[in-house]
Amino acid sequence: MMRLCLVEDSGAANLEPLTLTRATFDLMLGTSTLATKIARAFDIGPGPARRGAVIRTSLAEVQRSRDPHTAVNDRDWLGRGEVVVANGRWVPPADFDASGLFGGSAWVGLCEGRPACAWVGPEYAADLEPNCVDDWFDDLTSKVECSDIGGEWIDRPWDLVAKNSAHIRRDFEQDAKVGLTNRHLSSIALIGPAERLFIHETARIDPYTVFDTTNGPITVSAGA
């Protein structure tokens, strides 16, 4: 069973004030969090046996309350087997293919020359500690094979703003959201391509609401 551990490096400080009360990987980009994008890239689902995190100790209790199914700063969990360790500020490329990356010896994946993720056994994973992630990656890159895997970094708060539009489009395409019910079509005004608009069947839309998809997709989520 594949496992994923999301980690925070010293770059979390450069994302303040957004990261004062949340982990870096809980920041939104497009229509999902950075954590969701990383987990999707590696095709790793939720659950306490599959997800872990190494974050600032000041946020540990808050994170456990928000996400009780993730093992937070849990060295025992880290030492139970092989695991993908991913920097929570890394955004995998849209065409990322994780198949064939696992098994065999440990490796480090680089993005723009910086460690973005790694596949390691328990002998390395158990050494992960809060506030020491940079040193852990530096040590690992000196011992195992490293290769470029692409992607991009979220280094500053304004990166989320600058990249948001492109990721809204990317998320819409990856989610393959299509279709409007006749009920919605009969009550809205649409400007632009209909295939760029997704309205969940449970969403309540006031009559004659105008949706303009000329410049990009629009998603109305469940319960809206």
What are these regions (language model features)?
Residues 182, 188-189, 197, 202-209, ...:
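A structural motif detector for beta-strand N-caps
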Residues 214-216:
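Active-site-adjacent "gating/activation" loops or surface patches in catalytic cores
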